């Protein structure tokens, strides 16, 4: 039998300190019969109504004028479905009592959550609109094992933490309450009394929608339906296919011309998708779109990991954007940030008064570079929260891949730390073993549950096996950004051509380790901010030379083994650094303003993408020595490089680059196969605003030995240019 309700228990509800509401509220069996107890602050009267018949059963006694009611139904021994008729002054309202509903989380779910092995915890935790016993409402669940009390507050209860305290499940540390009549679109938060007795107001870590900053509430939103992976999308992600990625920051790609405000997801779809298709990119990569509080972080300090940012519209609108990309044959990659989170008080920091998501010791849990907190990957629930988030974006929005940010900062405990500022692992080493295991687990989950989706690592060190299968000891990524190639080649391109001969190895060294990983060649947003200048701004020389250098570099990059990534604005050589608060400088494409230079680069990138997609030698064997051969690698004095790309069926393309402003006429290059070679690309073409030096469309080999080969071709290599010569097969 249930014990009597004491005044101390009642006071606990009104000072919002009662952590076990179901022990008191709802229906309880007593010697006299079923006793019903309700808490409704400021109510005057309360009548119990049988839900099925609508019959009045009894009026409850007000035992505390603040709004606590108790009544016994004599001789009643069975629980039944009931409603409450509440009188607020002279007005009456019929409501459902959330404390008459049984727990909806079962023992297996609790065990899986605690073990961290539930594949999709977002199907259980968070806010889920549903129906229970014929009553519609929202089931709220929150993991906060050390909180003394948790209440749900929101639009539905005047944000009053006294009204809806939640049920605690000690097996899992999960708090739960089904709130009848709560509905989609309503705002909510969790009000906690933490383990120290402090009051905290927290957004839902599993919220599917969140308010736009500076507001911080979560919003009840439907869990999106699963988007099935198609064979076409799978094929486009494979390593033997052409992958050319257009990296986009949605807030600054284009803006409203009248007020400089963002376009929404649908407007972006109308403009971005046709543009990307026309330019020949195969993939779009979005900078992070999980909800984040600070615009200046570009999304790399997220708090609402399960909420597409409301800056550009609703979650459903983002799904439409992805769908539009798929309809155009374009795959979508999303930047994903599991490495750290900001310390905003409504977020994950000290969630229940303890370091729940982060490490307690700042030597493990504080990121000095970004003033953020580092996840505790060794905690089962945290690891599962993160790894399942990757699966959520892939399954529920149809995203085709994720690019994991700042992997090096995750896998090394001493990353950006001086001696004494970090804690070694259990073996005394610098590797973060828990983070490494987390990455392996996440990639396993992605590849086992969403076959065909890809993961890409931004990993800036020489950590071995980033793209090797996790079962073979690798991290399990599909691709890794080739930061070494990017840094070396950009350092070379910044040099005055006079000095390039002394740094020739910067353009060739990448082939020493080319086959150690599966690489993406990235010219990303990081290279055009914080005083680094734009790509065009990095190039030496006058205007003609700057543009010629950039065109030659792009030609070299698209010919070099590895998938391609180009940040928005670089496709038309924007002159200033990227500014996240403004649109790109599209006006430069007006020839009256840009003089045709920028449009020439735009045309080149479009042609590079088209040639890349149509010619198997340029992509099929990126990760095999069979697909590449240096023809001229040692001509540092002339800053000339030449290599051959091959496909599995014997097709061949020779890539020749001249990184000086001196044209090289009658330059002889040994070739592996005799025949005619047609010039399919020349970055010095007048079509791209070049000087139009070339080879009249074709060159034929001669039986003249050169570079250790019996046959050779004599070519004209334009100044500061790259040309592609394809072996004719007919």
UniProtKB/Swiss-Prot annotation:
Can you supply a Gene Ontology BP term from the record?
A: glycogen biosynthetic process
Q: Which reaction does it catalyse?
A: Transfers a segment of a (1->4)-alpha-D-glucan chain to a primary hydroxy group in a similar glucan chain
This protein's pathway = Glycan biosynthesis; glycogen biosynthesis
What domain of life? Answer: Bacteria
Class of the enzyme per the UniProt entry, highest EC level: transferase
Look up the EC number in the record and give it: 2.4.1.18
> What is annotated about its quaternary structure and interactions?
Monomer.
Q: Which family does it belong to?
A: Belongs to the glycosyl hydrolase 13 family. GlgB subfamily.
Name the chain's protein: 1,4-alpha-glucan branching enzyme GlgB
What is the organism of origin for this protein?
Haemophilus influenzae (strain ATCC 51907 / DSM 11121 / KW20 / Rd)
Designated gene of the protein: glgB
């Amino acid at each position: 039998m249930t014990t009597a309700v004491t005044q101390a228990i009642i006071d606990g509800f009104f000072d919002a300190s009662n952590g076990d509401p179901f022990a008191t509220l709802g229906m309880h069996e007593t010697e006299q019969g079923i006793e019903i107890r309700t808490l409704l602050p400021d109510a005057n009267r309360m009548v119990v109504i049988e839900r099925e018949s609508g019959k009045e059963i009894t009026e409850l006694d007000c035992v505390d004028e603040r709004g606590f009611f108790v009544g016994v139904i004599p001789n009643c021994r069975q629980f039944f479905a009931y409603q409450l008729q509440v009188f607020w002054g002279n007005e009456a309202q019929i409501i459902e009592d959330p404390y008459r509903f049984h727990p909806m989380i079962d023992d297996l779910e609790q065990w899986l959550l605690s073990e961290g092995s539930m594949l999709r915890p977002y199907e259980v935790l968070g806010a889920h609109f549903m129906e229970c016993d014929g009553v519609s409402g929202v089931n709220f669940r929150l993991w906060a094992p050390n909180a003394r009390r948790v209440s749900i507050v929101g639009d539905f209860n005047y944000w009053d933490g006294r009204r809806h305290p939640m049920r605690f499940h000690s097996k899992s540390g999960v708090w739960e309450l089904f709130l009848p009549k709560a509905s989609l679109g309503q705002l909510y938060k969790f009000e906690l009394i933490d383990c120290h007795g402090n009051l905290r107001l927290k957004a839902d870590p599993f919220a599917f929608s969140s308010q736009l900053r500076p507001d911080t509430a979560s919003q009840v939103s439907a869990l999106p339906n699963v988007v099935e992976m198609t064979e076409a999308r799978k094929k486009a992600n494979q390593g033997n296919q052409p992958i050319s990625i257009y990296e986009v920051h949605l807030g600054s790609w284009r803006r409203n011309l009248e007020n400089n405000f963002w376009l929404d997801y649908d407007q972006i779809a109308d403009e971005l998708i046709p543009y990307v298709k026309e330019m020949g990119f195969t993939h779009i990569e979005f900078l992070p779109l999980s909800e984040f509080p600070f615009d200046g972080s570009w999304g790399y300090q997220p708090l609402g990991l399960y909420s597409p940012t409301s800056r550009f519209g609703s979650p459903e609108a983002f799904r439409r954007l992805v769908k539009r990309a798929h309809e155009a044959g374009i795959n979508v990659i999303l930047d994903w940030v599991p490495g750290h989170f900001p310390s905003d008080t409504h977020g994950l920091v000290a969630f229940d008064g303890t370091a729940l998501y982060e490490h307690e010791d700042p030597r493990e849990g504080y990121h000095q570079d970004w003033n953020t907190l580092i996840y505790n990957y060794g905690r089962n629930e945290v690891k599962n929260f993160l790894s399942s988030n990757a699966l959520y974006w892939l399954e529920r929005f149809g995203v085709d891949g994720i690019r994991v940010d700042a992997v090096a900062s995750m896998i090394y405990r001493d990353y950006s730390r001086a001696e004494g500022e970090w804690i070694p692992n259990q073996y005394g080493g610098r590797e973060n073993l828990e983070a490494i295991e987390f990455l392996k687990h996440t990639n396993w989950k992605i590849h086992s549950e969403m076959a065909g989706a890809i993961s890409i690592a931004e990993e800036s060190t020489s950590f071995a096996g980033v793209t090797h299968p996790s079962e073979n000891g690798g991290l399990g990524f599909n691709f890794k950004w080739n930061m070494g190639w990017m840094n070396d080649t950009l350092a070379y391109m910044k040099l005055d051509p006079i000095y390039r001969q002394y740094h020739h190895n910067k353009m060739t060294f990448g082939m020493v380790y080319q086959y150690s990983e599966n690489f993406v060649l990235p010219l990303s947003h990081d290279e055009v901010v914080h005083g680094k200048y734009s790509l065009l701004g990095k190039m030496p020389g006058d205007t003609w030379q700057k543009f010629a250098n950039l065109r030659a570099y792009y030609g070299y990059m698209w010919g070099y083994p590895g998938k391609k990534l180009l940040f928005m604005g670089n496709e038309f050589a924007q002159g200033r650094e990227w500014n996240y608060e403004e649109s790109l400088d599209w006006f430069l494409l007006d020839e009256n303003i840009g003089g045709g230079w920028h449009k020439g680069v735009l045309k080149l990138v479009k042609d590079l993408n088209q040639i890349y997609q149509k010619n198997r030698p340029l992509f099929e064997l990126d990760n095999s020595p069979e697909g590449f051969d240096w023809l001229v690698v040692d001509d540092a004095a002339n800053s000339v490089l030449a290599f051959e790309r091959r496909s599995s069926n014997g097709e061949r393309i020779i890539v020749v680059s001249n990184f000086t402003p001196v044209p090289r006429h009658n330059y002889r290059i040994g070739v592996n196969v005799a025949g005619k070679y047609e010039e399919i690309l020349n970055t010095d073409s007048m079509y791209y605003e070049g000087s139009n030096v070339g080879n009249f469309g074709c060159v034929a080999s001669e039986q003249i030995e050169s570079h250790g080969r019996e046959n050779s071709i004599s070519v004209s290599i334009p100044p500061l240019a790259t040309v592609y010569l394809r072996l004719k097969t007919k």
